[in-house]
Amino acid sequence: MPKKNEQPASFETALTELEQIVTRLESGDLPLEEALNEFERGVQLARQGQVKLQQAEQRVQILLSQNEDAPLTPFTPDAE
């Protein structure tokens, strides 16, 4: 497992590690201190993932704004 301050290589790597942490926490077999450390790492990974998603969204909006003919509409998950 990467050290606390180490940045994950990619969004996908962070997501995979976060999923593993959730699985370990849900098992209920971890001692309290280890569970707290895992939870702390999970929060850190979730925040990093959120930042990466926001950056990706900004890049997409910039690319779309360069093509003025393409309408820019906010994403809504219910629209699918």
From Swiss-Prot:
Q: One Pfam family for this entry, by name?
A: Exonuc_VII_S
Per UniProt, which keywords does this protein have? Cytoplasm, Exonuclease, Hydrolase, Nuclease
Gene Ontology BP, a term: DNA catabolic process
Entry-linked SUPFAM superfamilies:
XseB-like
**Catalytic activity, per the record?**
Exonucleolytic cleavage in either 5'- to 3'- or 3'- to 5'-direction to yield nucleoside 5'-phosphates
Function, as annotated, reads: Bidirectionally degrades single-stranded DNA into large acid-insoluble oligonucleotides, which are then degraded further into small acid-soluble oligonucleotides.
Subunit structure and binding partners = Heterooligomer composed of large and small subunits.
UniProt name for this protein: Exodeoxyribonuclease 7 small subunit
Please state the gene responsible for encoding this protein: xseB
